[in-house]
């Protein structure tokens, strides 16, 4: 056993580096005469940046297997005006990696209270209560490592220049974060990047590159984030509230040209309560699942540098960026994979929109023969529009599509997509960008195979619901090169069948009639089918329904089996008959 103190030179260096004044320190050591055991306890009393007395104890234990255990307890620490810690406990384990060289194996930290400023605290002043942090490293195959990070906090508050009081700050309760990265190359060092984040020297470009590395510089990435509540006030009044939300993100990154992505989001409830009653809304039971299989993430990442340039650029360039066009062409040529997007919502309430038990899906698949399949579904138990006086019930949409010559269509539509459109506007000349937008649908070669819409249409408030059915099938070929028209091309072929229950127009329920008389929707629907109580010639009566069948062929349009010329002649005959029936004028 031996007792010693830190050297004066080291004390001066610590005082300068940590903004502290060390008043007293003692080192108590226990060691084995044969040198296979050493334990040191360091006790330090110091005054921090705020001149507050603090106590620090550090236990250093050299184990027989050459590993090192480090335990520390800190009463508190005010590093500067923006960084403050209270009641910190920590444990760490170091493993030997060479002669007198050690690498971090694991670390655990807890803090009763912590106040941290990121980016100099301008807009990211963060407060934690009862926070925990865990990090461990395990050796993987060859020079790769497996990293695991856990973080939790009972309370997290975010302040900025406009949210200086606790009542005005965004608050999250019950925050839990888990990140696992398997197969991280040994050359990747996140420490230096996070150090830039803490001292405010991390630029937007550095931040984007850091996130890209965290998500993709590994063989597999698994993460989850959950929170019990989030509250964001406005003008010291409740404004935004989120309850019991969680998300998961899993990435299989072994081959970024054929990556798998799995994303899940669940929200128990979320609402926004602005002062304007018409803008208040609340949603419950929200779920989103996104799966991407064999997706070319590498080609998506190739646009990151262009995105960073877009942030700085404000005007269209004088000439097209060839590197950007090459990246676009490569993206189109190698586009592949399957996607499956599913979303569900138990309820949604807003002044003029009420939804009950809504779900939707969108499945896509690229095929080897330059085809692209897509299948969209939508269902809702109820969708109500109070101001218009109507309600959809048992809504079901089923829409399968097939796109031929999909690569040409992807290239033509590239600049019309929201994300890629922003890139096009800053890396292509205005003339080139406008050309892409104008011709965005010219390469579409689409097959619609019996898309259907079924619903029961009711008034709001509810009275009686009656069925509506729509069936669509068709072919939309590519527009000929010599067609400069912006209109729908003439070579479209297909069928459009609409079936409406007669009772939508003939129901004599007094409550329903009163609602319909004061609804622009019902008035329009009535005028769409009938005029002065007489059925429009585009509809025919079949049993309990009014039906309209529209067929487009290479020879033109047929409506309920009749040509447009037949309908025109019929209209002229009816007009002539009406003129004959008018009483003669008298003097």
Give the predicted meaning of each segment:
Residues 3-587:
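Glycine-rich, small/hydroxylated-residue low-complexity segments
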